[in-house]
Amino acid sequence: ALVISLDGDGSTTYMIVVASMLPLYRRLKMNALSMTCLAMLASGVMNLTPWGGPTARAASALHVDAGDIFVPLVPVMGVAIVAILILAFCLGLRERRRLGVLSLPDGASLHAGYDEDGPKNLPEIEVDQDLRRPKLLWVNAGLTLALMVSLVMGVLPLPVLFMIAFAIALVINYPDLAEQRRRVAQHAGNVLSVVSLIFAAGIFTGILSGTGMVEAMSRSLLAVIPDAMGPYLAGITALVSLPFTFFMSNDAFYFGVLPILSEAAQGYGISPVEMARASLIGQPVHLLSPLVPSTYLLVGLAGVDFGDHQRYSLKWATMVCLVMLAAALAFGLFPLVGRIG
């Protein structure tokens, strides 16, 4: 789930993870809620990449570079990944104690990934064999690794790096010009939706700023924040991002609430990029929100109740968020106390 989530699409992660792991869980009589919980947490952490939704929204809303937000977040994501792996190990031990020693019939290992009584709604992924490039596996892996290293090192602006890597990958894998057109046309919808989001965000934030609403709302917010709590606004933003992104959409939080908090925080010496990093801490909890469509796909494919998934996963998602908050403060991604003057 951690590797698949690098594409920034939770739906893809859930389809692949559930299709491959649910039959094994059912065969071993394991709790499917642990699978949905771990898949969701992995998606929540890895979705902090610059091409993921939350980081792009925060960067657009506060007019900062996505690379300035993401690169310092890499160590925090590493700590969160370790926490998720430790949690997976602990949940596995708990399942072992619950189930004890299982006796499987002879030859069961040959069919471990097949469940005759499993759900019928698992996705059937049809792949056009003509589009596959197994001989170029290591070439594509090397190109992806080079792109990731360049992103972390900040060699060039993020859009330039992605355009260069995309052009190289397209030429290597599909040298025929007609096939290149078909590949671009097939995936153009995903690109256009993101571009539309950025334009809409720019219009929305422009209206808020140009009419003076952001300034007025920030002054109102400053008025209700006790002077003693103002310097802690970055940490407060990180904490309130858990319930805020649960009860409202990412668009509402990042384009409506975050600019106001950021404007108020500047009075305490906290920069917009630091506020953007703080606002991303609550993303693992956000994926439990009933406003997230991909979560319905996850519980539907796994055959579990949405409420059961929320009750089971909330404490673990909160724990991962708190680990990320502690790591972010330890690595200095945003200050615990603002720098006044």
Map each language-model feature to its residues.
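Core transmembrane alpha-helical segments of multi-pass membrane transporters/permeases
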Residues: L2, P159-V160, A167, V171-Y174, ...
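Membrane-interfacial loop-to-helix junctions in multi-pass transporters
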Residues: Y25-M35, K135-W138, A188-V195, S220-A238, ...
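Small-residue-rich segments of transmembrane alpha-helices in multi-pass membrane proteins
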Residues: S43-T49, S109-H111, N190-F204, P259, ...
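Helical membrane-embedded segments and adjacent short helical loop/helix-boundary regions
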Residues: L131-V139, L156-V160, A185-A201, M229, ...
